[in-house]
A protein has these predicted regions:
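Gly/Ser/Thr-rich loops at beta-strand to alpha-helix junctions
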Residues: 25-28, 71-75, 137-146, 162-166
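Redox- and metal-dependent alpha/beta enzyme cores, enriched for Fe-S-associated oxidoreductases
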Residues: 69-113
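A short, gly/pro- and small-residue-rich
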Residues: 35-46, 88, 149-164
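A short, acidic, amphipathic alpha-helical segment used as a generic capping/interface helix at domain edges
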Residues: 6, 119-132, 143-145
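Glycine-rich phosphate-binding "P-loop"
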Residues: 33-44, 99-123
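Single conserved hydrophobic/aromatic residue that forms the stacking wall/gate
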Residues: 1-12
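Extended, H/D-rich, highly charged conserved domains that either
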Residues: 13-72
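C-terminal functional extensions of proteins
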Residues: 146-221
Length: 221
């Protein structure tokens, strides 16, 4: 759809990014898109994950109003209530004022009730504008970057985590059970598997649907 492509181009051409996490194998290719970017600082992608560090960046969330935009919103709220059980280092998930917006998704072709992608994006922007927050953590597919840019334009802070955001709240996913994924991220091959042995971690079974297998072979479940 040419009109859809033009619309997406308009959304994504905004130069709002300050820091960009990349796989080391991809970094040499970034020169092809750099003319369209705002000269962000490149960092290894795994450094976005607070639980890989003994001094996690997420410690600065303490006492803040933190908005999380994710399809598993309700489960994130429940898991946060047991935050002290999820990680050995309490700085990974400190105490803060958690607020959530359930992200709109059309996983594998599931209908979401919106006329098109742009209407769904605007809905989530409106929900953000109605919420009082200091920093926004985002994991909702192709909507993530535009929503993070929207937060920045509103004078807020935002981090587009992508899929790994669920791990911050002790939610397992099959993607991270593959040792090759950890190696690709520059981590020990059993890094995620060790996290998953914690009995406080759960699977998002309640969010499975008929289309889940179409999403990278149900990688988030």
């Amino acid at each position: 759809d040419p009109e859809m492509s033009r619309g997406l181009g308009d959304v994504y051409k905004r130069q709002e990014m300050d820091i960009c996490g990349v796989f080391s194998s991809v970094e040499p290719l970034m020169r092809y898109v750099e003319p369209y970017m705002s000269s962000p600082l490149y960092v290894p992608l795994y450094t976005y994950s607070p639980f890989v560090s003994t001094r996690p960046w997420s410690r600065i969330l303490k006492g803040k109003k933190v908005l999380v935009i994710h399809p598993f919103a309700e489960l994130i709220v429940r898991q946060y209530q047991r935050r002290e059980q999820l990680f050995d280092n309490p700085d990974v998930l400190p105490e803060f004022d958690l607020k959530v917006i359930k992200a709109v998704q059309s996983l594998g072709g599931e209908s979401n009730g919106f006329a098109d992608w742009f209407e769904a994006l605007q809905y989530m922007k409106n929900e953000m504008d109605r919420t009082d927050y200091d920093i926004c953590l985002i994991g909702c597919g192709a909507y993530g970057f535009p929503l993070a840019a929207h937060a920045k334009r509103q004078g807020k802070k935002a981090i587009h985590f992508g899929g790994e955001l669920q791990l911050l709240f002790g939610i397992k996913g099959s993607r991270w059970e593959d040792p090759l994924h950890a190696i690709k991220c520059g981590l020990p091959q059993d890094f995620y598997q060790k996290l998953f042995t914690n009995p406080a971690w759960v699977r998002p079974e309640e969010y499975k649907n008929a289309h889940s297998l179409k999403v990278e072979n149900a990688c988030y479940w």
